[in-house]
Structure formats: C-alpha cells, structure tokens
Amino acid sequence: MKKKAVILLSGGPDSTTVLEIVSKTDYEIYALSFNYHRRNSLEVQKIQGLIKDYNVKQHRVINIDLQSFIGSALTDDNIDVPKFKNTDQLPSDIPVTYVPARNTIFLSYALGVVEVIGARDIFIGVHTNDYTNYPDCRPEYIKSFEAMANLATRVGVNGEKITIHAPLINMTKEQIIKKGLELGVDYSKTISCYDPTEDGLSCGQCLSCIARLDAFKKNNVQDPIKYV
C-alpha cells in the first residue's frame, strides 16, 4: 500500500515545484488549499487547472476567514499591496504582506487531515526567500512545528512520527525555478501575484512578482505568465 502525503498547494511556483517533486515518488497525494481572501481567490482557481496534470488522489479547498487578522495587505482591504520597481527596493524586514500565523494555521489544518486519512507526511513549499523575512518560513519554525505535531496528536503520542517536509527550505527563488524547469514544471499554470487584476493578469510590481521575475531572468528563461 502506498504511503499518503498531504501537500499544501497554493497555486504558486514554490508549492507547484513541491507537487512535482512528490509526484515523482510513490506517495499517494492529497492536496490541501485554502481560500481566505479575495486576493488569493485567483490562486485557488489556478489550482483547479494545475492538478489535472498530476495524479492527485484528493484535493480539498478549505474556506477560512483571515480578515480578522488586520494589518496584512493580503487580508486587510484597507491596506494597499506595496509596489516596487526592482529587487533593490524590496523591504529588508518583515513585509506588510505577512499574514499573522498563516502557515501555522495552514499546517494545523494539514495536521488534522493527516490524522483523518492515515498519512504521516506533510509537504510545504516554504523557503528562506532571498527577498522576504517571513518568520514562518524558517527551518527552525518547521522543526518546531514538527515537534509540536508529534506532541499534540494521537498518532504522534502513539509513536507514529509525523514528518513535515520542506524540500525547498534552503533554496533561493532562482534555484527553485531552476529545479522546477529541470523537472518539467509548467509554470504558465501558476501565479505568484499579491494583487492580480480581475481578469487574472499579474501586476508585475508586488514583492512576489518582482522576486518571481528576477528568478526567471537569472535562469535566462521568459516567465510564461501574463503581466499588466
């Protein structure tokens, strides 16, 4: 019987690269996505087309309301998504696009799914990005959450170890895109933008777009998605 794995899938290049990596293993894949604000709703739409390319056993989309977490440009309609011209302008501290406890919330849901379906492995596409300082993307965070997961679940207490896999954790965005291209990821079906237009065009100026464009440029490859 195949081992089961839960993959947190956002529709962006990082989680899609992880999906590609896991698809080349013997895991039975259970994808988990979240619809938490209008600014990420396009991501969820993209995922529907994306997973058709993969042998995903089940895809769950969980609707959660993070708008009470004010102070983030991704959940607070009163805060504009910052725009930049190049990587030199990107902030060196934790950006306003940080969503309080987002990965902790997402991983907690994944932990529940793991127990329900009998899986022991969770995959997430976090990495120590060259241009952001999200606290819930660090190696020590993943290690700590894994320790908590094994203390707070029945399977963990019973000695059946739950493992949080972050295969991109020490990679730069440039390295992730390079890896994905080598594996054959179709990045035209992904989206990174924090502030896309209603018809699905990426803004090309938010932190995520700038980092993505820079990564493709460094790989001497044209980004296949459309920008404003």
UniProtKB/Swiss-Prot annotation:
It is an enzyme of class 6 (ligase). GO terms for biological process: queuosine biosynthetic process. HAMAP family: QueC (MF_01633). ATP binds at L9, S10, G11, G12, P13, D14, S15, T16, T17, V18, L19. Binds 1 zinc ion per subunit. InterPro entries: QueC, Rossmann-like_a/b/a_fold. Pathway: Purine metabolism; 7-cyano-7-deazaguanine biosynthesis. It catalyses: 7-carboxy-7-deazaguanine + NH4(+) + ATP = 7-cyano-7-deazaguanine + ADP + phosphate + H2O + H(+). Catalyzes the ATP-dependent conversion of 7-carboxy-7-deazaguanine (CDG) to 7-cyano-7-deazaguanine (preQ(0)). Keywords: ATP-binding, Ligase, Metal-binding, Nucleotide-binding, Queuosine biosynthesis, Zinc. This is 7-cyano-7-deazaguanine synthase. It comes from the Bacteria. It comes from Rickettsia peacockii (strain Rustic). CDD domains: QueC-like. Its EC number is 6.3.4.20. One of its GO terms (molecular function) is ATP binding. Zn(2+) binds at C193, C203, C206, C209. Its cofactor is Zn(2+).
